[in-house]
Amino acid sequence: MRKKVLLMGRSGSGKSSMRSIVFSNYVAKDTRRLGATIDIEHSHVRFLGNLVLNLWDCGGQEAFMENYLSAQRDHIFRNVQVLIYVFDVESREFERDLVTFRNCLEATVANSPQARVFCLIHKMDLVQEDLRDLVFEERKAILLETSKDLETTCLATSIWDETLFKAWSAIVYTLIPNTPTLESHLREFAKAAEAAEVILFERTTFLVISSYSSESNPATDAHRFEKISNIVKQFKLSCSKMQAQFTTFELRGGNFSAFIVPYTEDTYILVVIADPEIESAVTLMNIQSARRFIEASKSASDGIQLQP
């Protein structure tokens, strides 16, 4: 099952940097050595079982953009599931970028009218902290008005914090065909295991696929999942540099315990238990039981097939 994703935006806006961090295990400081994308770079990323992201990273130089919108228009914009357009928040040519974005939208509507659009207002770390919300909301209002013919989501991003993982988790979530089923499984598992929270991560990228939070244990940090994605991925990279393999993580505090363990061939699961009296062995046994159940469910469906 292939899903075509276009990654577009002006040259230097940060498209290839974010792609390299999310899918190629780069750290933010190493993206400085990346050169400009020439024409189109194709990546086929096997994301979950039989789901393949067919990612088209389109070079943003003006000559390339003109070609995309003329000679290659039908070829590029046909059968697109998601258009990701990256805006450099510090660009001094926002109006010009907006014209190009509008042209890309017209091509998308003509060739892939059911596509979803994600506008990433990028490099937000360069904006003064107390002005970030204001700047983002101003740009968001303009972009939503411009893209009203397509379902559009605007997100603020930076390669230096968890916002990058939050944005790409949101994008990938729209491409997964059976998220209601996954959410139902996690909810039932959480109730059976008496878990405060359960989060499912894709194994390679550590993007959030699905989650469940108990109403009896409300969380205080809305960005906790993406922060965990970022932290664990950095830890996995550190393990790789030391020629060590990240397998399982367990943390026990005074009033909680947390486990990150392999769930299926394609996923990790994070389970947070608020009752400190529940033994680790019980939680791990519950995870093993749930693993068998979800594998059986997926193998019987036409959606993502998670293999042991």
UniProtKB/Swiss-Prot annotation:
The keyword Amino-acid biosynthesis is assigned to this record: no
Membrane topology (UniProt): Peripheral membrane protein
Protein EC: 3.6.5.-
Cleavable signal peptide: none
Top-level enzyme category: hydrolase
Family that this chain belongs to: Belongs to the GTR/RAG GTP-binding protein family.
Subunit relationships: Component of the GSE complex.
Protein name: GTP-binding protein gtr1
Organism: Schizosaccharomyces pombe (strain 972 / ATCC 24843)
